[in-house]
Regions:
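Eukaryote-biased recognition of intrinsically disordered, low-complexity regulatory segments
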Residues: 1-23
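Short beta-strand segments
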Residues: 18-22, 82, 97
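Short, contiguous acidic and Ser/Thr-rich linear segments
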Residues: 20-32
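Ferredoxin-type iron-sulfur electron-transfer modules in oxidoreductases and energy-metabolism complexes
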Residues: 31-50, 97-223
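Long, hydrophobic/aromatic-enriched structural stretches that serve as scaffold segments
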Residues: 49-50, 65, 69
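Short, structured protein-protein interaction patches enriched in aromatics and acidic/basic residues
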Residues: 53-65
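Glycine-rich phosphate/adenylate-binding loop and adjacent beta-alpha elements
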Residues: 70-91, 99
């Protein structure tokens, strides 16, 4: 498979960026999207050119590190699929693929496609935890939790913090991320003692980090 790539290149947060055209050939349909970028970077290195910087770690859809806007869609065309789990069989030979970083004031570009998402860390540090000692695993069954409540908390805890919700939102709001983290802990008995304080502090941290406000558009949910 031969592909044409239009990739955002930017040296640093304060430098001016631009799209640069590349092409890659002999890409397997079974290759992942990041493996395709690896192939491009190997080619660039062999030409003594600077490889494209992009975030990645586990490549298993778990860690939340991968963060690419592919053809205008955070994580690409496949729903409920992270960039690292996207495979090239979803593209056609000869396609032109536009690749850019998350776009948000709170997520400044570090280099090329890599962005600084430490604003999420600040939200978590403000209240995304339970300060009371909750005991060891042996003690967990001492507090019965209805299955419906446990399921709700687990659904919220499934957020991997990738930031696609922010990238999709026209306001660059982090309310889906913040709401998930608040809901996760506030749903459980161990977290209820601090739920009001937690909610206020985490929303304040979100606002202070420079995220926009939520206007109930729903773009965040569609890419989560």
């Amino acid at each position: 498979m031969k592909l044409n790539l239009k990739i955002w290149r930017q040296e640093s947060k304060n430098s001016k960026g631009e799209y640069v055209d590349y092409s890659v050939d002999n890409i397997s349909e079974e290759a992942s999207f990041l493996e395709m970028l690896d192939t491009l970077n190997e080619s660039l290195v062999s030409e003594n050119s600077v490889p494209v910087a992009f975030d990645h770690d586990c490549r298993e859809g778990i860690c939340g590190m991968c963060s690419l806007v592919i053809n205008g869609e955070p994580h690409g065309p496949e729903k409920a699929t992270t960039t690292c789990q996207l495979h090239m069989r979803h593209f056609k030979d000869g396609d032109t693929i536009t690749i850019e970083p998350w776009r948000a004031n709170a997520f400044p570009v570090i280099k090329d496609l890599a962005v600084d998402r430490s604003a999420f860390d600040k939200i978590m540090q403000s209240g995304g935890f339970v300060t009371a000692r909750t005991g060891s695993a042996v003690d967990a069954n001492e507090i019965p939790i209805p299955k419906e409540v446990a399921d709700k908390a687990m659904d919220a805890a499934a957020c991997i913090g990738c930031g696609a919700c922010v990238a999709a939102c026209p306001n660059a709001s982090a309310m889906l991320f913040t709401g998930a983290k608040v809901s996760h802990l506030n749903s459980l008995p161990q977290g209820k003692a601090e739920k009001e304080r937690r909610s206020v502090l985490m929303v304040q941290a979100m606002d202070q980090a420079g995220f926009g406000g939520c206007t109930n558009i729903g773009a965040c949910e569609s890419v989560c």
